[in-house]
Amino acid sequence: SAMTRMIKRKGTEGFSDDIQRVVASFVMSNARMSAKNIYAAQIEKSIQDIESGKSVKDQAYVMKENVFNPKENFAQLRNFLFLWNLGGSIFFGLLNMTQPYMQTLPHLSQYVPIGDATRAILRGSKIAGSAMKNGTAPKGYEAEYNRAVREGVVDPQNVFMLSGVERGKTGASNSAWGVITHTMGLIAQVTESFNRKAVFIAALDVANKKGAVWLKKKGFNSAYDFAKDTVDQTQGVYDKANRSNWANTSVGAPLMVFKQFSINYVEQMVRMWKKEAASGDEGKKAVFLMLAMLASLSGMMGLPFIKDILDVSETTAAFLGNPVNIEREARLALGKDLADPLFNGVLNHFVFNNLGMDIQSRTGMPDLVPWSNALNPTLSAQGRINEFASIGGATGGSIEKGYDASQFIARGNVGMAALTL
């Protein structure tokens, strides 16, 4: 920590020779200490002002300790799962670049017509691309853009990368591994930065068009504040402060890998749906647009909670003596030509499947509640095992893949084992 370094300046063998790690540790520890000194009193006052009851206040104190504690539970495991599932994937990069249209477009459509929101995002994407290519702030946006870069609004991944260097180990092998992991994460890093910069510029344009009076009415002091809020709401905040307390525990951390995106997605829909009509914001229309955008890629069977709803319905029907597979019956009733694009997604069915890609499994979030089908009496033994394993998320999925691969190896089928992994 910064305090330890000030009290006792002592070289540590191996550590002190690793210049990158020393500098990263210096920057991050001082940043944490400075932030704590600046915000600790304000955080304490906010907690003391909570009037929702002792349990809420207790959870707030737990969150405070989680944020102040620099330790990241299972950081290496989460890093491995990212590299294994998404690292170096061009397909993931292209899919990631749909996020401004999947989430930001509906958000901005609350305030301006859909056509205007679309044009703002397209223009923002063009300007952001040029800015990243030239390495300079876009003309006309210099002050806001440079501030957003400085405050980590559009490049938050740099903080996570510095934290990774700080936690790293020394030695040539670890240096080589660091180069590999950095290279594999470049696609995600570049596309994430591009998304945020495009959204930031698009939101600035919308805010400037609406004017200062409108911004004040909505609770924003400036166009910058509105743009920052738009980035946070639609591109996600992935730091420790925005995770549940359970996700910061040793048990919850490995189980919640890759869950934050779906949580952010559902929370955004809830926020928009709760907008009062008197506010002038078309929140409910934005929710339907958001669901339509998702359905175009993942189909009806990829919408949030849809599988959980079907699981509960089918379990209830089975206990009443009328077992049924609702999706299968619906497909039979509609016919293949109509059911496939409707259930699998129009774009997924007509475009991506023909290219050998499956967008539905990457974008859909139908099974958000674990064990929703666990009590179904018609479930097979393997289906029940899979249902209970679903709580493990990406971690459990990797373990399951490893087990399946070992079974193929035991039967001498190394090729299938490799494909399974």
Named regions from a protein language model:
Residues 305-392:
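Glycine-enriched catalytic-core subsegment of oxygenase/oxidase enzymes
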Residues 3-343:
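Hydrophobic, often aromatic-rich secondary-structure segments at membrane interfaces
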Residues 258, 395, 399-402:
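Hydrophobic, well-ordered secondary-structure elements that form the walls
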Residues 60-63, 399, 418:
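Composition-driven recognition of long, low-complexity, acid-poor segments enriched in small hydrophobic
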